[in-house]
């Protein structure tokens, strides 16, 4: 729209160029879609323009028309929508990968876990087989005591040992209580120790250590034999060259008896064979009488080994009484 100026020249409408274009162009044509890269370039351009001087920014905002503003807003909305779609797409992809990993049979169970399960299964199978085999051997005569072997016998009859053991032939070896059998065999007076072992497939072995007589003592019912521990284990004829014991209360708990037996065990074999009688009225007064009548004054039971060595040397000298009660000063009379 034009008018006439004061001098007759056409006057310019105060409206800006954009307004004139809006009036002459008519309705705005549809704008082609702008992709995200164009939006980012627009944002970059606008950011660069905004970093200019304050005056230029104010001028740009003052002369921005409706069409440019609408275009810029549409570009911003498209960029925001594209970013939202990209985020949603990333979320869907992550979820899909997680589900695929969970359903993947090669990743569902770690290899170490599979190996551990196999070991556990084999261990359980072996345990079951072991239990089944144990039950089979325990309740069936596959491995039974068909033979009973006794070793270490000298004076004890084997029948006496088998009777005391009381193991029925054909008893499964696993059902034989070896400790109980050993305790029954040890009740025999002449048995010092007894040991029972299973020897598969069908043998029960009994090992015995018999008591050995060291001294003998006369009783009204006959001679009683005593071993090195002072145990009265047999009644009967005394072996030759076995010394007689003179003690008030012989037994394993009598100190005088134990002292006399310690002296006999300390003597050299050739000297012990010469002893005919050992008297121990007390621990402090021990006397030996040799077969030929010589007397040995032993005294107390201390320093027994020294006294035994001194006596072996003194007996080579003539005399009737040998005093080793003081091993530092032995005498011969």
Curated annotation (Swiss-Prot):
Stretches with biased composition (Acidic residues): 11-22
Gene Ontology BP, a term: cell septum assembly
Skewed-composition ranges (Basic and acidic residues): 73-92
Subcellular location: Cell membrane
Region Disordered, residue ranges: 1-99
Domain of life: Bacteria
Transmembrane residue ranges: 119-139
UniProtKB keywords: Cell cycle, Cell division, Cell membrane, Membrane, Transmembrane, Transmembrane helix
Membrane topology according to the record: Single-pass type II membrane protein
Main location: membrane
Domain POTRA: 143-211
InterPro entries, per database record: Cell_div_FtsQ/DivIB_C, FtsQ, FtsQ_DivIB, POTRA, POTRA_FtsQ_type
Cytoplasmic membrane side: 1-118
Keyword field contains Transmembrane: yes
UniProt keyword annotation of Transmembrane present: yes
Amino acid composition bias (Low complexity), ranges on this chain: 44-57
All ranges on the Extracellular side of the membrane: 140-333
GO cellular component: cell division site; plasma membrane
Family of this protein: Belongs to the FtsQ/DivIB family. FtsQ subfamily.
Function: Essential cell division protein.
Name of the protein described by the UniProt record: Cell division protein FtsQ
Classification lineage: Bacteria, Bacillati, Actinomycetota, Actinomycetes, Mycobacteriales
